[in-house]
């Protein structure tokens, strides 16, 4: 192989057995059958390609350091490796697919592929009544279903013009169950994030306390998840007996658990090494990408809709908005831990504000008869109780039948309502054409928007830090794809 021979011509010579190959006697290379070498004058002997005739044809053997040159492979620094992470991957928080372009251990490009969990929730709402739509929307972000219910019902109540008619007790209970679910959501983030970084104790602790919160929500709503508890006009039912006592017991125990998390993780060298100065995104980057929630507050901007654009009477509660300045994964961890403590304060204030009263608006043309729920003593089954609630006239029975089967009508119009979910701004754009079903329901899910920050968080970093970046954003793919 001469110095002026190109790779392609050399390859052709090897493939076709061109005349520049020199034959060798049978067995000359210690192999039975004709053998030879391919090369030319002045070729370095270490770069010679030898061949052997066999029953299956000519077999070539390349020695030396020229394998990449013969194959035409580019320089090592120009190599491009594309790796798929997901959609079936334990560290992507659902069916999220990440297409990573890497050089060595450095990520040069991150592309997100979503849609694997699309269920058509928004479209399904257009074929159900205003109340039935809650059953679909509660399944969007399945780690914070009560926030989806609350944002949607607040939108419907604005269209109906009954925001001020919602009973105070119903509003207080709404705030209380939302803050309990905020704690549960952050505990899932702590548990899954700890598991992905190898902190299995954090996983056990996080899910242990989350079970306690889910037990409370099951006691109150009847279900651990996907509650359909918040309805247009109020709530599906009142608090059961013993709920307040169980919540107070949880409030007495949870602060000690949060201190345990700090003792376990905050000063842990490996935990800090994996998170400090990793996946940094400053406030300007968050604003440019539309990022909200703990990711934005960890960059130093105290934007919390409970304070900046209050709803459900949040302006009357005493609580702080935790922030940090570093904008890295460790700052997001600290912000979420502090938020759990602030949510405990709000729940405690809710218990102090609970007063006897209804949990549904008085307008029977809108409200389902929540009083028909079966109590622990069996009330709700007796004919006398049903007569008391429903009345005895045929008109009352007809009205109830039409309310449940056909639904109430909502005046034509459109509203956008946003609330602060565990992951950021959760917005609902609800459109009515004056009928008994929504004309359009669009969800501004915070996980969908926040995921757009993942390339900015991960590009230029290590492959191992991609897991940390996705975990620090805390996406829920049910809300992303819906």
From Swiss-Prot:
A cellular-component GO term for this protein: plasma membrane
Superkingdom classification of source: Bacteria
Enzymatic class: translocase
Bilayer topology annotation: Peripheral membrane protein
Region annotation (Disordered) ranges: 1-48
InterPro entries: NADH_Q_OxRdtase_suD, NDH1_su_D/H, NiFe-Hase_large
Compartment(s) where it occurs, according to its Swiss-Prot or TrEMBL record: Cell membrane
UniProt-listed Enzyme Commission number(s): 7.1.1.-
Keyword list, A-Z: Cell membrane, Membrane, NAD, Quinone, Translocase, Transport
GO MF: NAD binding; NADH:ubiquinone reductase (non-electrogenic) activity; quinone binding
Biased composition (Gly residues): 29-42
Parts forming coiled coils: none
Start-end of Low complexity biased regions: 1-16
Recorded catalytic activity of this chain's protein: a quinone + NADH + 5 H(+)(in) = a quinol + NAD(+) + 4 H(+)(out)
Keyword Translocase: yes
Listed Pfam families: Complex1_49kDa
Gene3D superfamilies: Cytochrome-c3 Hydrogenase, chain B
Family according to the record: Belongs to the complex I 49 kDa subunit family.
Self-association and partners: NDH-1 is composed of 14 different subunits. Subunits NuoB, C, D, E, F, and G constitute the peripheral sector of the complex.
Function description: NDH-1 shuttles electrons from NADH, via FMN and iron-sulfur (Fe-S) centers, to quinones in the respiratory chain. The immediate electron acceptor for the enzyme in this species is believed to be a menaquinone. Couples the redox reaction to proton translocation (for every two electrons transferred, four hydrogen ions are translocated across the cytoplasmic membrane), and thus conserves the redox energy in a proton gradient.
HAMAP family attached to this UniProt entry: NDH1_NuoD
Protein name: NADH-quinone oxidoreductase subunit D
Organism from which the protein derives: Frankia casuarinae (strain DSM 45818 / CECT 9043 / HFP020203 / CcI3)
